[in-house]
Amino acid sequence: MGNAAGSAEQPAGPTASPPKQPAVPKQPMPAAGELEERFTRVLNCMNLPPDKVQLLSQYDNEKKWELICDQERFQVKNPPAAYIQKLKSYLDTGGVSRKVASDWMSNLGFKRRVQESTQVLRELETSLRTNHIGWVQEFLNEENRGLDVLLEYLAFAQCSVAYDMESTDSVASGAEKSKPLDQSVEDLSKAPPSSVPKSRLTIKLTPAHSRKALRNSRIVSQKDDVHVCIMCLRAIMNYQSGFSLVMNHPACVNEIALSLNNKSPRTKALVLELLAAVCLVRGGHDIILAAFDNFKEVCGEQHRFEKLMEYFRHEDSNIDFMVACMQFINIVVHSVENMNFRVFLQYEFTHLGLDLYLERLRLTESDKLQVQIQAYLDNVFDVGTLLEETETKNAVLEHMEELQEQVATLTERLRDTENDSMAKIAELEKQLSQARKELETLRERFSESTPMGTSRRIPEPEKVPVPTVVRPSALELKVEELEEKGLIRILRGPGDVVSIEILPGAAATPSGDDAQAPRVSTDSPSTAESIPEAASPPPPPPPPPPPLPNLQSQQEAPPSAPPLAPPLPGCAEPPPAPPLPGDLPPPPPPPPLGTDGPVPPPPPPPPGGPPDILGGQGPDIGPGVKAKKPIQTKFRMPLLNWVALKPSQITGTVFTELNDEKVLQELDMNDFEEHFKTKSQGPCLDISALKGKASQKAPTKTILIEANRAKNLAITLRKGNLGADRICQAIETYDLQTLSLDFLELLTRFLPTDYERSLIARFEKEQRPMEELSEEDRFMLRFSRIQRLPERMNTLTFLGNFPDTAQLLMPQLNAIIAASMSIKSSDKLRQILEIVLAFGNYMNSSKRGAAYGFRLQSLDALLEMKSTDRKQTLLHYLVKVIAEKYPQLTGFHSDLHFLDKAGSVSLDSVLGDVRSLQRGLELTQREFVRQDDCLVLKEFLRANSPTMDKLLADSKTAQEAYESVVEYFGENPKTTSPSMFFSLFSRFTKAYKKAEQEVEQWKKEAAADTSGREEPPTPKSPPKARRQQMDLISELKRKQQKEPLIYESDRDGAIEDIITDLRNQPYIRADTGRRSARRRPPGPPLPVTTDLAL
């Protein structure tokens, strides 16, 4: 990694080529310690990144020794001062110093010295690029100032430009144009050199540079000295310290930019690559623009970048220069974040004719140039298009807001419509269920109306044979005997209709009188069933008594009611069963709202716990718990942040066995106080003084509620923003317009406790002035004077919550009713389960025996059972069988309603909420009885009592329907929740639909394969189209990758990395994908390099 810079010391002669050095024999390997030490020195000189250092450190000793020998073989032979001295010698008046002239100028002319200067610069560039970092730092230090010397020589090499401008004015242009080296050089100024401003930040030549030196400089500029100088600067900038030095130099970047006036397109391309890389470093864009401002002053341009555009238009024979120029223009315009500044820079080049020239280059054959042009066009910022997009966006946003409002309105309407349809379906399901019950009752009565039916009802229904009609005489005698004993009643209708009614009371208590029979018989069926039953017999038999005497009899003889309830089924008794529909007794109905029979439970206790220990003697102290007195301390003590237990909470705990007073007597508490007293203490006072002070202050301060509770009450009252009298008056009149529901719920927490009521009563008894109380205490005093305050607050909360709660419960009950009844009444579902049972028995009966049913969770197993080829499941096969053999069952899921909604309902919670509403309505009725002049309660009861009745009826129907359908499918309603039960059917229907779609897709694919085999195969797409598609995907993928717009120069090698990245892919901003997609003309995709291909 060293340099072969030895030629700088070789004498200049006709045969100046350095002699070849013989191969150095390999030295023996030193000891391990010395080897590691020398290897560490070599690594420090190589200036490698940490990952490479770690990799080389893992080498074995043989490889380490080889690396040490290689590095020592290429030792640095010339110090930086040798190169600096030679560069300074070329800057003398005659082009070389006297000392150097005496050594090697005697036999050489000036051109020979120019060739040697180029060789020196090449060796300097190699040294800067390959030597260790210490060599570069020595070249750039304050003593050598190598950067200043290099820039001065670069300015000297470019002096021929000014000389050419002067010679252009005095010499015929035709002779100049005939020179091959001047064919690509343009006039550097449109104005005479005298018009160029003198104040420019460049390297100025001293008066010592004579006219002869300028002519010599022209010869220098025709060589590669400028190009190699730029390479040297690039090598310096590749180091972090060197880059900082270059960026902070007042004229370095300016001289690099002025190198664009060189005649070589290769040099200009190198300069533009370096300037483009500097643009992408943080803070570099401003320095580049300042350098081109200086270029404008030096070269006399009317507009900035004018000469650059002239070179771009006329150097069309050198593709590398055009690619570098296009890349620089793209970066200098579009690498800034300020959009307005981007538009300004973009317009500068548009004004110079860039857009028109790019239109001419659109059909260029160079892929590299086309990619750079397309990258610029993708980054172009079209203000007109953005304005249109802004207007369109505003219109779209307004339209989107309107659509959102419409969606919200439609969603609300859809929810209301769904709830209405759910209610209607639930009502229709209830009517359908009632109609089926009535139909079953009519069928039973019709079967009983025949003699066969009458004789069949006396013994057990299933065991009596039909031929019993051959003995009618004995049967009639038996019936008459039972009727005489009061066990049955014969009801004769019109024609030959005869019905037999069992008297359960007589069967349960044979010795009872006949007056109990009608009472029990009317109590056994429900009210809805007793009315049509009483209307069916003809007038001669006495009808059963109405329900009102039944309720009266229940109130008169409450002890006898429980033993009369068990005989209701009547199935195990010898007498025949009654012809009434239904075999199971209905659940006991809730107590009616209008009756005053059983006393309702008292309202819940008011919130708030028992009083504190200090004032809570009496009822709050548990049995066996001794009251404790507060302890007076000599010093002020800090508070221990614990959660204390109340006396009522320690019963049966370990605390009942503890005696802390005994411990206090045994310990030295004075020492405890000395160690734990607070820092802010007054003088030590005795207990008597404290008691006297407390007794003096006590009369001046009265507290009715605890401090934290008073603070929370104050916050609540501020939220209500109402006075105490206004609040209490609204509570007394049930004014929900004044008191919001949220405020009521907050205020419920501050109902006076028993302890607070005792303090309030003591305060009023002593007739103390109100000024002693705080605002919160005065409110509590006024608040506690309200009659039946807990009942009123509960009633107010109920009045405010009832409409929303009822509106929330209704759809849930309807969903349960509709889903339960639709599942139970679906014949298609029953037939599908029948098919599933058949498949299961067919598969399992030989090993496990035949099954008579299955649990509903077994439906999930249909998806798990795979076929032999593992391509389909049992559910897919079931779908195929149903589609082929039972097409009428394919739409079975349309019979099942609201499964998902019913599955999300917690029936126990809903029933609990309904019962809570019922208790709240009863409380409201009692309040209205006590205060019948309240129009608010009267209007509420009138408007919402029907709603409550409907809720009660629907809750009972929902519970019965759900239990019925769960039991109907062999499940236990106590352990099966609606979420489990309905989710089984919901999952099955969804899986069935998905299986239907998959089977249909398989059919289409099979048909396509069949038709494909019949038709000739179509030729595949050519590989070229495939490659273009992959290139397009690669290009889109590249555009989606957000590269950083600005690089950091905080490491060595940053400039080389930036230049390499720009060569691999063009500079495209991440925010230009959409705009370029709209602007790009239709056609084949851009060719992408192999580095970007997928």
Swiss-Prot record:
It is found in: Cytoplasm; Cell membrane; Cytoplasmic vesicle, Phagosome. Residues 519-529 have a biased composition (Polar residues). Residues 1-29, 173-199, 507-627, 1002-1094 are annotated as: Disordered. Residues 27-464 form the GBD/FH3 domain. GO terms for cellular component: cytosol; phagocytic vesicle; plasma membrane. The keyword Coiled coil does not apply. The keyword Phosphoprotein applies. Keywords: Cell membrane, Cytoplasm, Cytoplasmic vesicle, Lipoprotein, Membrane, Myristate, Phosphoprotein. Residues 16-28, 535-549, 559-610 have a biased composition (Pro residues). It is a lipid-anchor. The DAD domain regulates activation via by an autoinhibitory interaction with the N-terminus. This autoinhibition is released upon competitive binding of an activated GTPase. The release of DAD allows the FH2 domain to then nucleate and elongate nonbranched actin filaments. Plays a role in the regulation of cell morphology and cytoskeletal organization. Required in the cortical actin filament dynamics and cell shape. May play a role in the control of cell motility and survival of macrophages. This is Formin-like protein 1.
